[in-house]
A protein has these predicted regions:
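Zinc-dependent metalloendopeptidases
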Residues: 1-269
Length: 269
């Protein structure tokens, strides 16, 4: 988001193109828990006020345990850069370590050997990460191939953009999902505007990709969710024109919020 001076001398807000990460959910045919995952995906709903039947709630409660993405609390996760300049690596590493002060997980950056988190800057032009322990699935994330990518971070990228993107992707690596897909997300999308926007640059997504990454919400019992957090690092800045509720844009968050801290501490006490 940038400020632009108009002829009257008053600053107006101009939104740069929204770059958001692509959710890397393992396809059913590559997931050993595919029957559980398929059932969970079928319970994704289009609105947060969907009410599930008692038998659905019980089934989802069981799946939430089987399908957990969390690492073991106290784990030391090895991270390895597959490419990128020394400056890009240094800036990424510094931001990633910020998560450690809030939870019982450590990141160890190594230069050789195996690593749970393998980082690229050139796999494609997008930003994405495996969600939690999905990184261990070698069918979907083969050894020596990235489990995380930063397609637009470069030497000259501002520090606040590194903070925004790296904290977000390492949030995924810890098992967090997008805040705008939480069942507690209260904003109302302008579906036609969303479809038009994300089919264009810089994302070029298909309608199915847009539904999967923006419009759909998880079932209320499919994930752990309390209240919607407008300051969450897992929420991207969306232009107000993408909503039909007239409430303006979502925040441009570059640091973890108080609720992010509380949630990650609960995940990894």
């Amino acid at each position: 988001m940038i400020r632009k001076t108009v002829p009257s001398g008053i600053y107006s807000i101009v939104h740069e193109p929204v770059k958001i990460c692509f959710e890397r959910i393992i396809p059913d045919n590559m997931d050993p828990e595919r029957s559980v995952r398929r059932a969970l995906r079928e319970h994704m709903v289009a609105s947060a006020d969907h009410t599930l039947k008692a038998d659905e709630l019980a089934h989802l409660a069981r799946m939430a345990v089987v399908n957990s993405k969390k690492w073991q609390p106290g784990a030391m996760l090895k991270c390895h850069f597959l490419d990128g300049s020394p400056k890009m690596r240094k800036k990424t590493q510094a931001v990633a370590h910020q998560w450690e002060q809030y939870c019982d997980i450590k990141f160890k950056f190594v230069t050789s050997g195996t690593a749970e988190i393998r980082i690229s800057f050139y796999a494609d032009n997008g930003s994405w990460s495996a969600v939690g322990r999905d990184a261990l699935n070698q069918t979907y994330f083969p050894p020596h191939q990235p489990t995380m990518n930063y397609g637009w971070l470069r030497d000259g990228t501002p520090n606040n953009e590194y903070s925004r993107v790296v904290l977000h992707e390492f949030g995924h690596a810890l098992g967090c999902v997008h805040e705008h897909q939480s069942p507690k997300f209260t904003r109302k999308w302008n579906t036609a505007a969303v479809m038009k926007y994300f089919q264009g640059p810089p994302n070029y997504w298909s309608p199915d990709d847009i539904r999967h990454n923006v419009l759909e919400k998880y079932s209320p019992r499919g994930i752990s969710a309390t209240k919607f957090d407008p300051k969450s690092i897992m929420l991207y800045s969306f232009d107000g024109a993408l909503f039909s509720d007239g409430l303006g844009s979502t925040n441009e968050n570059t640091t973890v919020s108080k609720d992010d801290v509380r949630m990650i501490k609960a995940m990894y006490p």
